[in-house]
Amino acid sequence: MSQTPAVSRRLLLGSAAATGALATGIGSAAPVAAAEQAPRRRPGQKSMIGVPFAAHPTVRVAVIGLGNRGGGMITGWAAVPGCTVTAVCDIRADRAERAADRLESKGNPRPAEYGGSADSYARMLRRDDIDLVYIATPWEFHYEHGRAALLSGRHAVVELPVATELRQLWDLVDTSERTRRHLLLSENCNYGRNELAMLKAAHDGLFGDLTNGHGGYLHDLRELLFSDTYYTDSWRRLWHTRSTASFYPMHGLAPIAAAMDVNRGDRMTTLRATTTAPKGLADYRARFVPRDHPSWKETYINGDLVTCMIETAKGRTVRAEHDVSSPRPYSRINTLAGSRGIVEDYAGSAPTGARIYVEPDHGGHTWRDFETYRKEYDHWLWQKVGDDAANNGGHGGMDYVLQWRTVQLMRAGLVPDIDVYDSAAWCSPVPLSVTSLARGGRPVEIPDFTRGAWRERRPGLDSAPTDMPPAG
Protein backbone atom coordinates (compact mmCIF):
# COMPACT_ATOMS: atom_id res chain seq x y z
CA MET A 1 0.00 0.00 0.00
CA SER A 2 2.15 2.82 -1.27
CA GLN A 3 1.58 6.14 0.42
CA THR A 4 1.91 7.97 -2.91
CA PRO A 5 -1.45 9.04 -4.35
CA ALA A 6 -2.48 6.72 -7.17
CA VAL A 7 -4.09 9.46 -9.22
CA SER A 8 -5.61 8.12 -12.41
CA ARG A 9 -4.63 9.10 -15.92
CA ARG A 10 -8.09 10.63 -16.35
CA LEU A 11 -7.50 13.00 -13.45
CA LEU A 12 -4.08 13.97 -14.77
CA LEU A 13 -5.35 14.56 -18.30
CA GLY A 14 -8.30 16.48 -16.95
CA SER A 15 -6.00 18.79 -15.03
CA ALA A 16 -3.84 19.42 -18.07
CA ALA A 17 -6.86 20.11 -20.24
CA ALA A 18 -8.28 22.48 -17.65
CA THR A 19 -5.32 24.82 -18.06
CA GLY A 20 -6.08 25.39 -21.72
CA ALA A 21 -9.84 25.35 -21.36
CA LEU A 22 -9.87 28.00 -18.66
CA ALA A 23 -7.72 30.23 -20.82
CA THR A 24 -10.30 30.17 -23.61
CA GLY A 25 -13.35 30.79 -21.41
CA ILE A 26 -16.55 28.87 -20.80
CA GLY A 27 -18.06 27.18 -23.82
CA SER A 28 -21.62 26.13 -24.59
CA ALA A 29 -24.04 26.05 -21.68
CA ALA A 30 -25.41 22.67 -22.75
CA PRO A 31 -24.46 20.04 -20.17
CA VAL A 32 -21.85 17.51 -21.16
CA ALA A 33 -22.88 13.90 -20.63
CA ALA A 34 -21.03 12.15 -17.84
CA ALA A 35 -18.29 9.88 -19.12
CA GLU A 36 -19.84 6.76 -17.60
CA GLN A 37 -23.57 6.23 -18.11
CA ALA A 38 -25.62 4.19 -15.67
CA PRO A 39 -24.61 0.56 -16.15
CA ARG A 40 -27.36 -2.00 -16.33
CA ARG A 41 -27.95 -4.13 -13.30
CA ARG A 42 -26.83 -7.71 -13.64
CA PRO A 43 -29.45 -10.46 -13.40
CA GLY A 44 -30.46 -10.85 -9.78
CA GLN A 45 -28.92 -7.52 -8.74
CA LYS A 46 -31.39 -5.38 -6.79
CA SER A 47 -31.54 -1.96 -5.21
CA MET A 48 -30.42 -1.50 -1.61
CA ILE A 49 -32.89 1.34 -1.02
CA GLY A 50 -35.00 0.58 2.02
CA VAL A 51 -33.07 -2.59 2.86
CA PRO A 52 -32.54 -2.86 6.63
CA PHE A 53 -29.48 -4.22 8.33
CA ALA A 54 -29.83 -7.68 9.76
CA ALA A 55 -30.15 -7.23 13.52
CA HIS A 56 -26.88 -7.71 15.41
CA PRO A 57 -26.79 -8.31 19.17
CA THR A 58 -23.29 -6.84 19.14
CA VAL A 59 -21.58 -4.93 16.35
CA ARG A 60 -17.99 -6.07 15.83
CA VAL A 61 -15.91 -3.39 14.10
CA ALA A 62 -12.61 -3.72 12.26
CA VAL A 63 -10.64 -0.57 11.43
CA ILE A 64 -8.41 -0.03 8.38
CA GLY A 65 -6.21 3.05 8.66
CA LEU A 66 -4.96 4.30 12.02
CA GLY A 67 -3.55 7.71 11.21
CA ASN A 68 -4.99 10.95 12.55
CA ARG A 69 -8.59 10.15 11.64
CA GLY A 70 -8.74 6.41 12.20
CA GLY A 71 -6.63 6.53 15.31
CA GLY A 72 -8.91 9.18 16.75
CA MET A 73 -12.14 7.31 16.01
CA ILE A 74 -11.34 3.90 17.53
CA THR A 75 -12.19 4.87 21.10
CA GLY A 76 -15.51 6.31 19.93
CA TRP A 77 -16.50 3.01 18.35
CA ALA A 78 -15.53 1.13 21.50
CA ALA A 79 -17.55 3.54 23.68
CA VAL A 80 -20.85 2.88 21.89
CA PRO A 81 -23.05 0.41 23.82
CA GLY A 82 -23.08 -2.99 22.15
CA CYS A 83 -20.04 -2.31 19.98
CA THR A 84 -16.56 -3.78 20.19
CA VAL A 85 -13.44 -3.25 18.08
CA THR A 86 -12.17 -6.72 17.21
CA ALA A 87 -9.32 -5.92 14.79
CA VAL A 88 -7.19 -2.95 13.74
CA CYS A 89 -4.98 -2.58 10.69
CA ASP A 90 -2.46 -0.12 9.30
CA ILE A 91 0.39 -0.54 6.85
CA ARG A 92 2.57 0.69 9.70
CA ALA A 93 2.39 -2.12 12.23
CA ASP A 94 3.42 0.15 15.11
CA ARG A 95 0.21 2.11 14.66
CA ALA A 96 -1.87 -1.04 15.02
CA GLU A 97 0.01 -1.89 18.20
CA ARG A 98 -0.50 1.60 19.64
CA ALA A 99 -4.20 1.52 18.78
CA ALA A 100 -4.60 -1.84 20.50
CA ASP A 101 -2.70 -0.53 23.53
CA ARG A 102 -4.97 2.49 23.71
CA LEU A 103 -8.16 0.44 23.60
CA GLU A 104 -6.86 -2.01 26.16
CA SER A 105 -5.79 0.79 28.50
CA LYS A 106 -9.40 2.01 28.56
CA GLY A 107 -10.69 -1.37 29.66
CA ASN A 108 -11.69 -2.72 26.26
CA PRO A 109 -10.78 -6.18 24.95
CA ARG A 110 -7.51 -6.01 23.03
CA PRO A 111 -8.19 -6.16 19.28
CA ALA A 112 -6.19 -8.32 16.89
CA GLU A 113 -3.42 -6.38 15.14
CA TYR A 114 -2.59 -6.38 11.43
CA GLY A 115 0.02 -4.36 9.57
CA GLY A 116 3.37 -4.20 7.89
CA SER A 117 2.31 -4.74 4.28
CA ALA A 118 -0.06 -3.44 1.63
CA ASP A 119 -2.28 -6.52 1.87
CA SER A 120 -2.53 -6.65 5.65
CA TYR A 121 -6.15 -5.53 5.45
CA ALA A 122 -6.99 -8.51 3.20
CA ARG A 123 -5.65 -10.90 5.83
CA MET A 124 -7.73 -9.13 8.47
CA LEU A 125 -10.89 -9.45 6.37
CA ARG A 126 -10.55 -13.24 6.49
CA ARG A 127 -11.52 -13.16 10.16
CA ASP A 128 -14.97 -14.37 11.16
CA ASP A 129 -15.58 -11.86 13.97
CA ILE A 130 -16.20 -8.72 11.89
CA ASP A 131 -19.60 -7.18 11.08
CA LEU A 132 -18.57 -3.67 10.04
CA VAL A 133 -15.37 -2.29 8.53
CA TYR A 134 -14.49 1.34 9.21
CA ILE A 135 -12.05 2.74 6.62
CA ALA A 136 -9.91 5.81 7.32
CA THR A 137 -6.98 5.41 4.94
CA PRO A 138 -5.78 8.10 2.48
CA TRP A 139 -8.35 8.98 -0.19
CA GLU A 140 -6.71 6.97 -2.95
CA PHE A 141 -7.32 3.70 -1.07
CA HIS A 142 -10.96 4.20 -0.07
CA TYR A 143 -12.42 2.50 -3.13
CA GLU A 144 -10.12 -0.52 -2.88
CA HIS A 145 -10.74 -1.02 0.82
CA GLY A 146 -14.47 -0.32 0.68
CA ARG A 147 -15.00 -2.74 -2.18
CA ALA A 148 -12.94 -5.42 -0.43
CA ALA A 149 -15.04 -5.04 2.71
CA LEU A 150 -18.27 -5.53 0.75
CA LEU A 151 -16.90 -8.55 -1.09
CA SER A 152 -15.88 -10.09 2.22
CA GLY A 153 -19.52 -9.95 3.32
CA ARG A 154 -19.19 -6.97 5.66
CA HIS A 155 -20.85 -3.59 5.76
CA ALA A 156 -18.52 -0.63 5.30
CA VAL A 157 -18.32 2.89 6.71
CA VAL A 158 -15.86 4.84 4.56
CA GLU A 159 -14.33 8.22 5.24
CA LEU A 160 -14.61 11.00 2.64
CA PRO A 161 -14.64 10.48 -0.30
CA VAL A 162 -15.72 6.87 -0.80
CA ALA A 163 -14.01 6.98 -4.23
CA THR A 164 -12.37 9.52 -6.54
CA GLU A 165 -13.52 8.21 -9.95
CA LEU A 166 -17.01 7.99 -11.44
CA ARG A 167 -16.52 4.38 -12.51
CA GLN A 168 -15.44 3.54 -8.95
CA LEU A 169 -18.57 5.14 -7.53
CA TRP A 170 -20.73 3.08 -9.87
CA ASP A 171 -18.81 -0.06 -8.96
CA LEU A 172 -19.37 0.53 -5.26
CA VAL A 173 -23.10 0.94 -5.92
CA ASP A 174 -23.18 -2.27 -7.94
CA THR A 175 -21.02 -4.19 -5.47
CA SER A 176 -23.29 -3.13 -2.61
CA GLU A 177 -26.32 -4.32 -4.57
CA ARG A 178 -24.72 -7.65 -5.51
CA THR A 179 -23.36 -8.45 -2.05
CA ARG A 180 -26.45 -7.12 -0.22
CA ARG A 181 -24.18 -5.20 2.10
CA HIS A 182 -24.38 -1.51 2.89
CA LEU A 183 -21.64 1.03 2.21
CA LEU A 184 -22.03 4.35 4.01
CA LEU A 185 -20.10 7.58 3.69
CA SER A 186 -18.81 8.56 7.13
CA GLU A 187 -20.22 12.07 6.77
CA ASN A 188 -20.10 13.28 10.35
CA CYS A 189 -21.29 16.77 9.39
CA ASN A 190 -24.73 15.37 8.59
CA TYR A 191 -24.96 14.60 12.31
CA GLY A 192 -23.95 18.06 13.50
CA ARG A 193 -26.45 19.65 15.87
CA ASN A 194 -27.05 22.72 13.71
CA GLU A 195 -27.23 20.62 10.54
CA LEU A 196 -29.83 18.23 11.94
CA ALA A 197 -31.92 21.08 13.36
CA MET A 198 -31.73 22.81 9.98
CA LEU A 199 -32.90 19.62 8.27
CA LYS A 200 -35.87 19.22 10.64
CA ALA A 201 -36.83 22.89 10.25
CA ALA A 202 -36.66 22.61 6.46
CA HIS A 203 -38.79 19.48 6.42
CA ASP A 204 -41.30 21.23 8.70
CA GLY A 205 -41.63 24.02 6.12
CA LEU A 206 -39.98 26.76 8.19
CA PHE A 207 -38.13 28.15 5.16
CA GLY A 208 -41.02 27.67 2.74
CA ASP A 209 -40.18 26.09 -0.61
CA LEU A 210 -36.44 25.51 -0.63
CA THR A 211 -34.63 27.28 -3.47
CA ASN A 212 -30.89 27.23 -2.76
CA GLY A 213 -28.14 26.20 -0.40
CA HIS A 214 -24.50 27.01 0.13
CA GLY A 215 -21.97 24.78 1.86
CA GLY A 216 -18.25 24.30 1.90
CA TYR A 217 -15.11 23.00 3.45
CA LEU A 218 -13.05 26.10 4.15
CA HIS A 219 -10.24 25.05 6.44
CA ASP A 220 -6.75 26.51 6.60
CA LEU A 221 -4.67 23.31 6.48
CA ARG A 222 -1.42 24.87 5.26
CA GLU A 223 0.59 24.19 8.41
CA LEU A 224 -0.62 20.58 8.55
CA LEU A 225 -0.10 20.04 4.83
CA PHE A 226 3.57 20.99 5.18
CA SER A 227 4.06 19.06 8.41
CA ASP A 228 6.41 16.08 8.12
CA THR A 229 4.38 14.05 10.62
CA TYR A 230 0.68 14.88 10.29
CA TYR A 231 -0.21 13.41 6.86
CA THR A 232 1.87 10.28 6.32
CA ASP A 233 4.24 10.73 3.38
CA SER A 234 2.52 14.07 2.71
CA TRP A 235 -0.26 12.22 0.89
CA ARG A 236 -2.79 15.02 1.18
CA ARG A 237 -0.45 17.77 -0.04
CA LEU A 238 0.58 15.66 -3.02
CA TRP A 239 -2.99 15.63 -4.31
CA HIS A 240 -2.53 19.37 -4.94
CA THR A 241 0.35 18.59 -7.33
CA ARG A 242 -1.51 16.04 -9.45
CA SER A 243 -5.06 17.14 -10.04
CA THR A 244 -7.36 20.14 -10.33
CA ALA A 245 -10.56 19.19 -8.54
CA SER A 246 -12.89 19.80 -5.64
CA PHE A 247 -11.26 17.17 -3.45
CA TYR A 248 -13.47 17.37 -0.39
CA PRO A 249 -16.81 19.13 -0.95
CA MET A 250 -18.94 16.63 0.98
CA HIS A 251 -18.87 18.35 4.39
CA GLY A 252 -20.70 21.34 2.95
CA LEU A 253 -22.76 19.61 0.28
CA ALA A 254 -24.17 16.63 2.16
CA PRO A 255 -26.18 18.46 4.85
CA ILE A 256 -27.72 20.75 2.22
CA ALA A 257 -28.54 17.77 -0.02
CA ALA A 258 -30.15 15.95 2.90
CA ALA A 259 -32.30 18.97 3.77
CA MET A 260 -33.37 19.17 0.12
CA ASP A 261 -34.31 15.47 0.08
CA VAL A 262 -31.82 14.66 -2.66
CA ASN A 263 -32.41 11.02 -3.68
CA ARG A 264 -35.72 11.20 -1.78
CA GLY A 265 -37.87 13.35 -4.07
CA ASP A 266 -35.22 15.48 -5.77
CA ARG A 267 -31.86 14.76 -7.33
CA MET A 268 -28.73 16.60 -8.40
CA THR A 269 -28.70 16.87 -12.20
CA THR A 270 -25.81 19.07 -13.36
CA LEU A 271 -22.57 20.49 -12.00
CA ARG A 272 -20.31 23.24 -13.23
CA ALA A 273 -17.00 24.03 -11.56
CA THR A 274 -14.76 27.07 -11.38
CA THR A 275 -11.37 27.50 -9.78
CA THR A 276 -9.05 30.26 -8.73
CA ALA A 277 -5.34 30.23 -9.42
CA PRO A 278 -3.17 28.08 -7.12
CA LYS A 279 -1.41 30.64 -4.92
CA GLY A 280 -1.80 29.75 -1.26
CA LEU A 281 0.45 26.71 -0.83
CA ALA A 282 3.36 28.15 -2.80
CA ASP A 283 3.10 31.42 -0.89
CA TYR A 284 3.07 29.63 2.46
CA ARG A 285 6.06 27.52 1.44
CA ALA A 286 8.01 30.60 0.39
CA ARG A 287 7.46 32.25 3.76
CA PHE A 288 7.66 29.39 6.22
CA VAL A 289 9.23 26.24 4.74
CA PRO A 290 13.04 25.72 4.66
CA ARG A 291 14.60 25.51 1.20
CA ASP A 292 15.86 21.99 1.81
CA HIS A 293 12.34 20.67 2.44
CA PRO A 294 11.13 18.07 -0.13
CA SER A 295 8.10 20.22 -0.95
CA TRP A 296 10.34 22.63 -2.90
CA LYS A 297 10.41 20.06 -5.70
CA GLU A 298 6.62 20.28 -6.02
CA THR A 299 4.41 22.43 -8.24
CA TYR A 300 0.88 23.05 -6.99
CA ILE A 301 -1.80 23.02 -9.66
CA ASN A 302 -5.06 22.79 -7.74
CA GLY A 303 -6.78 26.13 -7.34
CA ASP A 304 -7.11 27.55 -3.85
CA LEU A 305 -10.89 27.90 -4.08
CA VAL A 306 -12.78 25.37 -6.19
CA THR A 307 -16.51 26.07 -6.47
CA CYS A 308 -19.14 23.65 -7.74
CA MET A 309 -22.54 25.01 -8.78
CA ILE A 310 -25.05 22.18 -8.70
CA GLU A 311 -28.60 22.21 -10.05
CA THR A 312 -31.38 19.82 -9.06
CA ALA A 313 -34.39 18.36 -10.84
CA LYS A 314 -36.67 20.70 -8.87
CA GLY A 315 -34.79 23.80 -10.00
CA ARG A 316 -32.81 24.34 -6.82
CA THR A 317 -29.14 25.26 -6.69
CA VAL A 318 -26.36 24.28 -4.32
CA ARG A 319 -23.00 26.03 -4.18
CA ALA A 320 -20.27 23.79 -2.74
CA GLU A 321 -16.83 25.28 -2.06
CA HIS A 322 -13.46 23.77 -1.17
CA ASP A 323 -10.46 25.74 0.08
CA VAL A 324 -7.73 24.39 2.36
CA SER A 325 -4.94 26.64 1.04
CA SER A 326 -5.96 30.12 2.22
CA PRO A 327 -5.59 31.94 5.56
CA ARG A 328 -9.09 32.12 7.03
CA PRO A 329 -11.20 30.94 9.97
CA TYR A 330 -12.84 27.55 9.64
CA SER A 331 -16.27 27.41 8.00
CA ARG A 332 -18.63 24.92 6.39
CA ILE A 333 -20.97 27.84 5.51
CA ASN A 334 -24.07 25.64 5.96
CA THR A 335 -26.65 28.03 4.53
CA LEU A 336 -30.15 27.06 3.40
CA ALA A 337 -32.76 29.38 1.88
CA GLY A 338 -36.32 29.20 0.66
CA SER A 339 -39.35 31.28 -0.21
CA ARG A 340 -39.95 32.22 3.45
CA GLY A 341 -36.51 32.60 4.94
CA ILE A 342 -32.91 31.61 5.40
CA VAL A 343 -30.54 30.11 7.98
CA GLU A 344 -26.84 30.92 7.80
CA ASP A 345 -24.22 29.12 9.88
CA TYR A 346 -20.69 30.28 10.81
CA ALA A 347 -21.97 33.83 10.90
CA GLY A 348 -21.12 35.56 14.14
CA SER A 349 -20.66 35.18 17.87
CA ALA A 350 -24.09 33.84 18.84
CA PRO A 351 -24.02 30.68 21.01
CA THR A 352 -25.09 28.47 18.11
CA GLY A 353 -22.82 30.20 15.61
CA ALA A 354 -25.81 30.51 13.27
CA ARG A 355 -28.34 33.20 12.43
CA ILE A 356 -31.80 33.07 10.91
CA TYR A 357 -34.40 35.24 9.22
CA VAL A 358 -37.85 33.79 8.51
CA GLU A 359 -41.29 35.19 7.79
CA PRO A 360 -43.58 35.97 9.52
CA ASP A 361 -41.45 35.79 12.68
CA HIS A 362 -38.88 38.39 11.69
CA GLY A 363 -38.80 41.77 10.01
CA GLY A 364 -36.77 44.90 9.65
CA HIS A 365 -34.06 43.14 7.65
CA THR A 366 -32.45 42.06 10.93
CA TRP A 367 -30.87 38.68 11.60
CA ARG A 368 -31.86 36.72 14.72
CA ASP A 369 -29.95 34.05 16.63
CA PHE A 370 -30.74 30.47 15.64
CA GLU A 371 -30.84 29.30 19.27
CA THR A 372 -34.63 29.37 19.77
CA TYR A 373 -35.19 27.42 16.57
CA ARG A 374 -32.45 24.93 17.36
CA LYS A 375 -34.17 24.15 20.64
CA GLU A 376 -37.50 23.70 18.85
CA TYR A 377 -36.05 21.50 16.12
CA ASP A 378 -33.32 19.77 18.12
CA HIS A 379 -32.92 16.27 16.69
CA TRP A 380 -33.76 13.39 18.97
CA LEU A 381 -30.26 11.95 18.51
CA TRP A 382 -28.71 14.98 20.20
CA GLN A 383 -31.31 14.93 22.95
CA LYS A 384 -30.54 11.26 23.61
CA VAL A 385 -26.76 11.06 23.25
CA GLY A 386 -25.57 14.66 23.26
CA ASP A 387 -23.94 14.36 26.68
CA ASP A 388 -22.18 11.12 25.73
CA ALA A 389 -21.08 12.71 22.46
CA ALA A 390 -19.42 15.56 24.31
CA ASN A 391 -17.35 13.05 26.29
CA ASN A 392 -16.54 10.54 23.56
CA GLY A 393 -16.40 12.25 20.19
CA GLY A 394 -14.42 14.83 18.29
CA HIS A 395 -15.71 17.69 16.14
CA GLY A 396 -18.14 18.88 18.78
CA GLY A 397 -19.56 15.42 19.35
CA MET A 398 -20.88 14.71 15.86
CA ASP A 399 -18.32 11.93 15.33
CA TYR A 400 -19.78 9.98 18.22
CA VAL A 401 -23.38 10.69 17.16
CA LEU A 402 -22.56 9.15 13.77
CA GLN A 403 -20.93 6.14 15.42
CA TRP A 404 -23.74 5.66 17.96
CA ARG A 405 -26.41 5.90 15.28
CA THR A 406 -24.60 3.47 12.95
CA VAL A 407 -24.31 0.89 15.72
CA GLN A 408 -27.93 1.44 16.72
CA LEU A 409 -29.12 0.92 13.14
CA MET A 410 -27.22 -2.35 12.93
CA ARG A 411 -28.26 -3.63 16.35
CA ALA A 412 -31.93 -2.74 15.83
CA GLY A 413 -32.06 -3.98 12.23
CA LEU A 414 -33.04 -0.63 10.72
CA VAL A 415 -32.52 1.01 7.32
CA PRO A 416 -29.38 3.21 7.22
CA ASP A 417 -29.81 6.99 7.30
CA ILE A 418 -27.14 7.36 4.60
CA ASP A 419 -26.95 4.70 1.91
CA VAL A 420 -24.62 3.87 -0.96
CA TYR A 421 -26.65 6.06 -3.35
CA ASP A 422 -26.28 9.11 -1.11
CA SER A 423 -22.60 8.30 -0.68
CA ALA A 424 -22.00 8.10 -4.43
CA ALA A 425 -24.00 11.24 -5.23
CA TRP A 426 -22.35 13.36 -2.55
CA CYS A 427 -18.87 12.24 -3.65
CA SER A 428 -19.53 12.63 -7.39
CA PRO A 429 -18.38 16.29 -7.45
CA VAL A 430 -14.81 15.05 -6.96
CA PRO A 431 -14.49 13.48 -10.44
CA LEU A 432 -17.16 15.65 -12.07
CA SER A 433 -15.37 18.85 -11.09
CA VAL A 434 -12.34 17.54 -12.99
CA THR A 435 -14.46 17.04 -16.10
CA SER A 436 -16.13 20.44 -15.84
CA LEU A 437 -12.87 22.30 -15.25
CA ALA A 438 -11.21 20.48 -18.13
CA ARG A 439 -14.01 21.77 -20.37
CA GLY A 440 -13.77 25.38 -19.33
CA GLY A 441 -16.39 25.23 -16.61
CA ARG A 442 -19.14 23.78 -18.77
CA PRO A 443 -21.92 21.97 -16.89
CA VAL A 444 -21.69 18.18 -16.74
CA GLU A 445 -24.46 15.73 -16.01
CA ILE A 446 -24.57 14.11 -12.58
CA PRO A 447 -25.49 10.43 -12.82
CA ASP A 448 -28.60 9.11 -11.12
CA PHE A 449 -27.07 6.43 -8.94
CA THR A 450 -30.56 5.35 -7.79
CA ARG A 451 -31.49 4.43 -11.39
CA GLY A 452 -34.80 6.29 -11.19
CA ALA A 453 -35.73 5.60 -7.57
CA TRP A 454 -34.94 9.18 -6.48
CA ARG A 455 -38.57 10.16 -7.04
CA GLU A 456 -39.71 8.00 -4.11
CA ARG A 457 -40.14 9.87 -0.83
CA ARG A 458 -38.51 7.97 2.03
CA PRO A 459 -36.94 8.70 5.39
CA GLY A 460 -33.31 9.57 5.77
CA LEU A 461 -31.67 11.56 8.52
CA ASP A 462 -35.11 12.75 9.66
CA SER A 463 -35.55 9.49 11.54
CA ALA A 464 -38.04 8.59 14.26
CA PRO A 465 -36.78 8.40 17.86
CA THR A 466 -35.47 4.92 18.60
CA ASP A 467 -33.86 3.38 21.65
CA MET A 468 -30.60 1.47 21.55
CA PRO A 469 -31.51 -2.22 21.94
CA PRO A 470 -30.67 -3.59 25.39
CA ALA A 471 -27.48 -5.56 25.78
CA GLY A 472 -27.89 -9.21 24.87
UniProtKB/Swiss-Prot annotation:
Amino-acid positions noted as binding substrate in the UniProt annotation, renumbered to this chain: 217, 236, 248-251, 330
Cofactor(s) this protein cannot do without: NAD(+)
Pfam families (UniProt xref): GFO_IDH_MocA (PF01408), Glyco_hydro_109_C (PF21252)
InterPro entries: Gfo/Idh/MocA-like_OxRdtase_N, Gfo/Idh/MocA_oxidrdct_glycsds, Glyco_hydro_109_C, NAD(P)-bd_dom_sf, TAT_signal
EC annotation from Swiss-Prot or TrEMBL: 3.2.1.-
Residues of the signal peptide: 1-35
Swiss-Prot/TrEMBL keywords: Glycosidase, Hydrolase, NAD, Signal
SUPFAM superfamilies the UniProt entry points to: NAD(P)-binding Rossmann-fold domains
PROSITE patterns for this protein: TAT
Post-translational modification: Predicted to be exported by the Tat system. The position of the signal peptide cleavage has not been experimentally proven.
Residues annotated for NAD(+) binding in this entry: 68-69, 90, 139-142, 145, 159-160, 188, 248
Molecular-function GO terms, alphabetical: hydrolase activity, acting on glycosyl bonds; nucleotide binding
Gene3D superfamilies for the chain: Dihydrodipicolinate Reductase, domain 2, NAD(P)-binding Rossmann-like Domain
Cofactor annotation comment: Binds 1 NAD(+) per subunit. The NAD(+) cannot dissociate.
Disulfide bridges in this chain: none
Function comment: Glycosidase. Has no alpha-N-acetylgalactosaminidase activity.
Family, per entry: Belongs to the Gfo/Idh/MocA family. Glycosyl hydrolase 109 subfamily.
Name listed for the protein in its UniProt record: Glycosyl hydrolase family 109 protein
Species of the source: Streptomyces coelicolor (strain ATCC BAA-471 / A3(2) / M145)
